[in-house]
A protein has these predicted regions:
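Active-site loop ensemble at the mouth of alpha/beta enzyme cores that anchors a bound cofactor
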Residues: 32
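Polybasic, low-complexity binding patches
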Residues: 35-67
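C-terminal, charged low-complexity interaction regions
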Residues: 74-122
Length: 122
């Protein structure tokens, strides 16, 4: 990405083994290197992450050209049933979106912690 940003996985790729949109975020390249294969602290990072995800969701819903890109991406990179049926359905409020995202991501995050993934202390 221009401007020194990478696309990072909130929950490390080595744990989720996918590139689904619900787990991706733009991140400063140097911070991405520092985070490496660790989990971000749930608080405060999840709130910021969910906010960025909601911005993406609104763009998908409101901009036909972005919705078209989302549709192409969805075919290859959106295999979680909950994401297609709940997260990216039309007309979610921000609160609904955040709750759906947290409800589905927190168990995956906690499972990664139990499997020994370290938390990135930033």
């Amino acid at each position: 990405m221009p401007g020194g940003y990478d696309i990072d996985h909130f929950i490390p790729w080595s744990f989720v083994m996918n590139d689904e949109l619900w787990n991706l975020m733009p991140m400063d390249s140097s911070l991405n290197s520092s985070k490496s294969n660790r989990l971000p602290q749930w608080d405060p990072f999840f709130r910021k992450f969910a906010g960025n995800q909601y911005i993406l969701y609104k763009l998908i819903q409101e901009k036909p050209e972005i919705h078209k890109l989302y549709e192409a991406c969805w075919r290859d990179n959106l295999h979680s049933i909950w994401a297609g049926q709940e997260l990216y359905r039309p007309r979610n409020t921000k609160e609904e979106f955040d709750n759906i995202l947290a409800k589905n991501m927190r168990p995956v995050y906690d499972s990664a912690r139990r499997q020994g993934y370290e938390v990135w202390m930033r």
